[in-house]
Amino acid sequence: MTAWVGLTGGIGSGKSAAAQYFADLGVPRIDADAAAHSLTASDGIALPEIRRLFGDTVFDTQGLLRRDILRKEIFASPSRKALLESVMLPLIFSEIKKQQETFTDAVYGIVEIPLLTEKRQFISLIRRVLTISAPLEKRIGRVMARSGLTRGEVADIISHQASESERLLLADDVLLNDGSLKSLREKTMLLHAFYSGIFASKPTQGKHNG
C-alpha cells in the first residue's frame, strides 16, 4: 500500500520545485492544481456546472473557460469563491483519490496541495503533511520575478492565504527553503531517504490517518 505525503506551502515557497525533485527521484507525484485545470479544460466535467452558476460571461465564444475573468470574480467576492469551491473541491478530491489508486507498489507518493491548510478535507487522503516554508521576502521576490506582479499584488495574494504559523501547526515535517535550488534538492533527497525508511517499516506512520 502506498503511503501519501501531502506537500503544501504558500505562494513562492518553492513547493512545486520540491515536488518535482521528489518526482525526479522516482516518487509518484499528484498535483491538485493540475487536477483542477483538467477539470476545467475543454470538455472538462466541471464546466457545465460552472456555466450554470456563473453564466456565459466566464466563457469565450469557443466555449472555453475564461480563467482570468472567473479569477477576478471570485477574488472580489467571498460568496462567489465559496460557490466555485462547492463545485470544484469534491471533483478535485475524487480525481486525486482516483490517481492515488493507480499507484499500488510505491512505498510512498507526494500529493501537492497548495491549500491543504485551508481545505482540511484533503487530509483524509494523506498520512503526513510536509510544509515547504520560506522567509516572506524571499517568497515575494520569487513571485515577482516569475510573474511580473508588483510587490503589493503579491502581498495581497499572500494575505488571502493561510498564515505561515497555521501551516506549521498542521505539519508533520518542515522543509525550510531559504537558499538555492541546489540546497532545496539536497534537503528533498534527505526527506526522500527519511520517508522511504519510515513508510517501508510503518506504512501508517504519521498523525494523519488517510
Swiss-Prot record:
InterPro entries: Depp_CoAkinase, P-loop_NTPase. Gene3D superfamilies: P-loop containing nucleotide triphosphate hydrolases. It catalyses: 3'-dephospho-CoA + ATP = ADP + CoA + H(+). NCBIfam families: dephospho-CoA kinase. PANTHER family: BIFUNCTIONAL COENZYME A SYNTHASE-RELATED (PTHR10695:SF46), DEPHOSPHO-COA KINASE-RELATED (PTHR10695). Catalyzes the phosphorylation of the 3'-hydroxyl group of dephosphocoenzyme A to form coenzyme A. This is Dephospho-CoA kinase. It comes from Neisseria gonorrhoeae (strain ATCC 700825 / FA 1090). The lineage of its organism: Bacteria, Pseudomonadati, Pseudomonadota, Betaproteobacteria, Neisseriales.
